[in-house]
Amino acid sequence: PGSLIPVIKRNSPITSDIVTGLTNTFFIFIISLRRVIITIPYVHCNRLRILALSEDAARAVSESLGDAGEIRLCLRSSAVLVSNVLKDFIHEHPHVSFSISSEPKGCDLLIDSVSSAYDIPDNAHLLMTEEICLAVSSSHPLAHTGHISVEQMMDEKFIDLADTQSYAGVFNSIFCKCKKTPQIAYSCNDYILQGKLISLGLGVSFVASVTWTSSSLPENISLLHIDDCPHFRSIYYQPLGSFCSENQRIFEHQLEEYFKKLNK
């Protein structure tokens, strides 16, 4: 790999850094073999690190030669909002492909949310914090008030958003101190169906306020603030791996700009 560095430096400083890192890691690994007792876990750990850097180096060289490549995205939250950014990015950069996964392993970028901004990983970037509200039909007795208490929610029939860790976390957190939990009337895994059921007055559900108002969902729905148990979620993105392509940096910038406009 060292022989490639002089050639690559003329084209891409980032590519040079990746290849240099791979070279250094390889030689450190070889030198360390003389100083430690070799164990299978030790070799396995370093092998994975070298393989990961090798893959990053290959992608860096490929990009320096004009290959747009793909962005491997782990999307665990805010799919409704991120899809808007993806649509615009793909329209402007049709040569770039995306692969979407729900697991971060092997991905370049993670988009997720946590209940507190303090829980965001150190190398992650906050995109937006939004309030969790209770979505009810406009015909609901409390719709005109804009507020509801945990006690008042106990008699409601909830529409559960299945297979969503963030929703389950909010639900459990709000009702964890209650002696009973509200009835689950329906369970679905589709935001559009959830909205239709709420608009028909068939139940209520917790929703992220900014995400909800930014989506094309039924208008005859009111959002109620939870007075005695306010909840929020913080959406963030986190680069994964040591290689970040120019296209990924552009996509990250567009993410930041899109969410910045939503916060206004």
PLM regions with names:
Residues 118, 139-148, 229-231, 241-247:
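Short helix-loop capping/hinge motifs at secondary-structure junctions, enriched
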Residues 120-132, 136-158:
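Flexible hinge/capping segments at coil-to-helix
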Residues 39-63:
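Alpha-helical "hinge/linker" immediately C-terminal to small N-terminal DNA-binding modules
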Residues 98, 121-125, 129-131, 192-241:
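Beta-alpha-beta core module
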Residues 142-143, 156-178, 246, 262:
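Secondary-structure junction motif
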Residues 3, 9-16, 29-35:
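Low-acidity, Ser/Thr- and Arg-rich intrinsically disordered low-complexity segments
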Residues 67-119, 188:
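Central regulatory/effector-binding core of bacterial HTH transcription factors
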Residues 41-46, 81, 85, 170-171, ...:
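Short amphipathic alpha-helical coupling segments at ligand-binding clamshell hinges
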